[in-house]
Amino acid sequence: MNNSNNGVEWWLIRHGVTAWNLQRKYQGHSDEELLPGEASGLTPLRSKLAGQSFAGVYCSDLKRCRQTLQLIRPDWTGQAVYDPRLREMNFGAWEGKTYEMLEHNPLYRAWIDDPKLHTPPEGESWELFQNRITDFQRELLQKSKELAVSGNGNPSILLIVTHGGVMSTLNMLMSPDADFWDSKVLPGEIMKLKLRSNELGW
């Protein structure tokens, strides 16, 4: 393929601040709302994204991500794809709890030491979590390939509003040298992954 200059970028957004973020509670699939107004921490991001063109927008179907999209780009709320695969890991019985509340639980300690081998009670295994993110990534790569082929030489940007664990997984999948724990993205922050057709073997 000769159009290697037709870059595609994934702009990954972590949802804004919730009360549980401040209380350092596991949220997972719990449908928590953002803090109101400036407390959500999204004002700088809203300014940064104002007027930016996107080739597509994807969003976790959980309330805190929907509200984030509504605040940062309300013009896209009706066109975005709301995908449950973009949810955070399901922490099961540990949701709503803090590290301090769980630190003496033997299963929790084992999970902290090796989350690939242990699963939260009533929660989601590491394998299931990784598999659904990988499934989404494959579809997004196909979309990116189509954008690269049809592009005019300018980067096409896909916006993904999601959660910290999902962002870490996508970064790990797209960056061979990256580890899941390398990404430390705070609520309301952005991570940009720049793809090139020649880098992906298209």
List the model feature ranges, each with a label.
Residues L71, T169-L173:
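Active-site signature of alpha/beta-hydrolase-fold catalytic machinery across serine-
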Residues T43-S47, Q130, T134-K145, N171:
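Generic structural signal for well-ordered alpha-helical scaffold segments
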Residues M1-V8, G153-N154:
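Extreme N-terminus of proteins, especially the signal/transit-peptide cleavage junction
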Residues S175-W202:
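Domain-level recognition of soluble alpha/beta enzyme cores
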Residues V8, I13, V17-W76:
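Active-site-proximal alpha-helix that buttresses catalytic centers in soluble enzyme cores
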Residues G164-S168:
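GST superfamily/GST-like fold recognition
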